[in-house]
Design a protein with these regions (language model features):
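An amphipathic alpha-helix signature
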Residues: 79-83, 120, 124, 128, ...
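Amphipathic alpha-helical segments used for helix-helix packing
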Residues: 90-121, 162
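Alpha-helical DNA-contacting segments of helix-turn-helix folds
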Residues: 56-63, 70
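Basic, helix-initiating cap at the start of DNA-binding domains
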Residues: 1-43, 50-54, 65
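Short alpha-helical scaffolding segments that buttress acidic/His motifs in well-ordered protein cores
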Residues: 85, 98-105, 148-152
């Protein structure tokens, strides 16, 4: 008798779904395609996730401790954030839930809302608080945080969604770090 592990099966389905949604967006991915890739029946996807929408929402759940990268002296903020960003872009290739949300945000309003909520909670607000706590006035801290957030999202969209190459990771990290630092310092 074959033992069944529902948690492992569910995780395998999610891994394949993330990969497919990240590469192809929401519209072209099918329940059958994910089921075939995961080696399961499409009925299991319906049972575990309720269908394609539920599968998408589960695959796009983002939990990234962005705030961990901002602690420290403001003079090193750009370097810390850039290192974290490039590591994520290189390490989560093809399965990054954030990439799933970015790619699907033009197709699905709930993906756009989930991406906006994630960025507000995990990027914009922590940066705003950090910059304010480092001595900037509240409005200035918010403006600089918004500039950093918009810059990183723009670069991510250009490099990951539009499928341009990331290029040399060290050069990318140095450029991102310098640009983020200029924005944090109000020089951008």
């Amino acid at each position: 008798m074959i033992s069944r592990d529902a948690a492992a099966t569910r995780q395998r389905i999610l891994e394949h779904a993330r990969r497919q949604f990240a590469r192809h967006g929401y519209t072209t991915v099918t329940v059958k395609g994910v089921a075939d890739a995961a080696g399961v029946s499409p009925n299991l996807i319906t049972r575990y996730f309720g269908g394609k929408d539920g599968l998408f929402l589960a695959a796009a759940r983002v939990e990234i401790p962005v705030a961990d990268s901002i602690h420290g002296d403001r003079a090193g903020l750009g370097a810390r954030l850039a290192a974290s960003i490039v590591q994520r872009w290189l390490g989560a290739h093809g399965e990054d839930p954030l990439l799933v949300l970015q790619r699907a945000s033009g197709e699905r309003p709930e993906a756009a809302e989930a991406l906006a909520a994630f960025l507000d909670t995990n990027s914009l607000e922590p940066l705003h608080r950090y910059l304010r706590d480092s001595g900037l006035a509240d409005a200035e801290a918010r403006d600089r945080a918004a500039a950093i957030d918009a810059f990183v999202l723009g670069v991510s969209t250009r490099r990951r969604i539009l499928r341009a190459e990331l290029g040399d990771p060290a050069a990318l990290e140095a450029w991102l770090g310098a640009t983020i630092q200029r924005l944090a310092d109000g020089l951008g």
